[in-house]
């Protein structure tokens, strides 16, 4: 392709709302253009990158034995009502009515659609397993779309769904998809990490996320420095911390005026934060009600809200207001485990089970209890509630845990029978008994990967595409296209590189200065440039490595062999 024939509207102007490098460079480089909040068009270079990523995803999915299909972007609301997600998906699911008043949805995901496709068409265990996938547009009406392609409302996604007759076969496919995804991200040239994850609104039991490692990542990952353990902080675990506090006397109430924070309590009582219990009061949001819930964790720990939300099966947790707390009969700053109002739901962190000698609120203004004994509590619920901290010990190997940032670019789930049961999608087993399909779900954010590549690979000048994702491998830059000899050599090298199977763009723009062409090369991020300029008089051209910006002089007749060597 020739630059003069291609629509590549580069600009020096950075969008006002673009804070991430990928957003800035993809817009400035003419890869994408915003048409609305969280909605982007892909221009020629962006479309090439998108299709390259799509092709790699498709190749590996097909190799794994999955069947490609295509679901309608628009689905009837009745499917979502059948599964029960018409209400639980919330405002992110965009609904509309047609001229006949029929209710429809712009699909944010396709569990319902795939169950509807397979239901009554696969009826026997003999026809299982089955894996269907698509690479198609999705729409989620994000409240705050931002970061360009990273968190848009409309996006391209690969979503796959598998159907099984046994849990064992689901696990086999789940593991196969983990291997397949690793192949995809490796082919794309990305540094990534597979981590344990929370299943979120999709549901199911086991799930893993695939994160592209980048400082700008929205997700905090907990990783071990000694083994392969990794988890999203929402699902991370640590080796339990143990303490041996003495219970010097029976529990007693101590006057602790104006000591509402953990630090104030610890200082007043002359104990460590580890010897205190923190009460976090939340309002749990359910489909048809709200409820005050208290989560108790050690004073030195922090509550992990996703874990807490899962512990009470809520749609969402929000901070309880002062009025909420008073109305529930609680005392802010002095809330404790003992003598709570009987109607209050509370959950205790697992690491506090049967602990003794700790201090907590006395549920009375200006008073705390000391020397408590949690083993005396009856019929209480314990749950892993804490957010793992850097320096905690790995539960797998005893190594140190640390944080890193990641961009979620893939997620795989063991769904079980959640959707098949809800939608009455069954098969006949070996004994002729009807059973719901056991399902898996596997997603990759294809358009998000376009941005993720750049978040991991850029400098202060622009994009640095990996070899697998670059729109063109080589940019031939003719320093002065008005000079006949330079233009001629440019055309010859362009033709030879194409014949050698190297994707190449020829910057033949007559009215663009050399400095402008080089700036575009650095912004657009093609892996290599071949610069034809003054050195041509000596039979030489320059090859520039975009990643390092190193330049080497190469004889004109050796350019092809050198490029072939570099792109291996």
Swiss-Prot record:
It catalyses: tRNA(Pro) + L-proline + ATP = L-prolyl-tRNA(Pro) + AMP + diphosphate. Pfam families: HGTP_anticodon (PF03129), tRNA-synt_2b (PF00587), tRNA_edit (PF04073). Its main location: cytoplasm. One of its GO terms (biological process) is prolyl-tRNA aminoacylation. SUPFAM superfamilies: Class II aaRS ABD-related, Class II aaRS and biotin synthetases, YbaK/ProRS associated domain. Its EC number is 6.1.1.15. GO terms for cellular component: cytosol. Keywords: Aminoacyl-tRNA synthetase, ATP-binding, Cytoplasm, Ligase, Nucleotide-binding, Protein biosynthesis. It is an enzyme of class 6 (ligase). GO terms for molecular function: aminoacyl-tRNA deacylase activity; ATP binding; proline-tRNA ligase activity. CDD domains: ProRS-INS, ProRS_anticodon_short, ProRS_core_prok. InterPro entries: aa-tRNA-synt_IIb, aa-tRNA-synth_II, aa-tRNA-synth_II/BPL/LPL, Anticodon-bd, Anticodon-bd_dom_sf, Pro-tRNA-ligase_IIa, Pro-tRNA-synth_IIa_bac-type, Pro-tRNA-Synthase_IIa_type1. It comes from the Bacteria. Transmembrane segments: none annotated. It is found in: Cytoplasm. Catalyzes the attachment of proline to tRNA(Pro) in a two-step reaction: proline is first activated by ATP to form Pro-AMP and then transferred to the acceptor end of tRNA(Pro). As ProRS can inadvertently accommodate and process non-cognate amino acids such as alanine and cysteine, to avoid such errors it has two additional distinct editing activities against alanine. One activity is designated as 'pretransfer' editing and involves the tRNA(Pro)-independent hydrolysis of activated Ala-AMP. Homodimer. Belongs to the class-II aminoacyl-tRNA synthetase family. ProS type 1 subfamily. Consists of three domains: the N-terminal catalytic domain, the editing domain and the C-terminal anticodon-binding domain. This is Proline--tRNA ligase. It comes from Aliarcobacter butzleri (strain RM4018) (Arcobacter butzleri). The gene is proS.
